[in-house]
């Protein structure tokens, strides 16, 4: 059940996600790799793809925070909080890499955050089985989208590739965690709707 303390924590988390630089406890993947020379076209492509990945992490933060607010089981809430901390690291990694590439973050991050937070709240209200099932499916789709980015990133952009590779590993772990905690299999129409929404987000974030 929602209470004032949880709402304050949620509001603080939203401000930190959208306005404050993200922090990471783990070393940034690829930080010791060489910064190979990229053409302007390659830099723009890498920056756009990393912007999409950053938006994905903004959405993940919002989703986890919304789900944690309405989760009914303390064990589930703790698992969501742990995953959210790892997603914060992804936020920091992508943010840093965008800056290194001379790119910018999406202007629509508040919109992405608000929509994902609402989805997280709704998923949590439906109960932990569907809450975790929604999380697992989200992470599977994110993992697939990161695999696609590994195909699209310039081969010589080894720093971006190292970050995306580690993110892909972490997302797979989050999906496994959600299933192990009792996540249910979502109906096929819900999965299709999620893919459609994700496609709109990624195509928009590529440019905006």
Swiss-Prot record:
Binds 2 iron ions per subunit. Its cofactor is Fe cation. It is found in: Cell membrane. GO terms for molecular function: 3-demethoxyubiquinol 3-hydroxylase activity; metal ion binding. It is a peripheral membrane protein. InterPro entries: COQ7_proteobact (IPR047809), Ferritin-like (IPR012347), Ferritin-like_SF (IPR009078), Ubq_synth_Coq7 (IPR011566). Fe cation 2 binds at residues 87, 139, 171, 174. Keywords: Cell membrane, Iron, Membrane, Metal-binding, Monooxygenase, Oxidoreductase, Ubiquinone biosynthesis. It holds the Pfam family COQ7. PANTHER family: 5-DEMETHOXYUBIQUINONE HYDROXYLASE, MITOCHONDRIAL, COENZYME Q10 BIOSYNTHESIS PROTEIN 7. Belongs to the COQ7 family. NCBIfam families: DMQ_monoox_COQ7. This is 3-demethoxyubiquinol 3-hydroxylase. It comes from Nitrosomonas europaea (strain ATCC 19718 / CIP 103999 / KCTC 2705 / NBRC 14298).
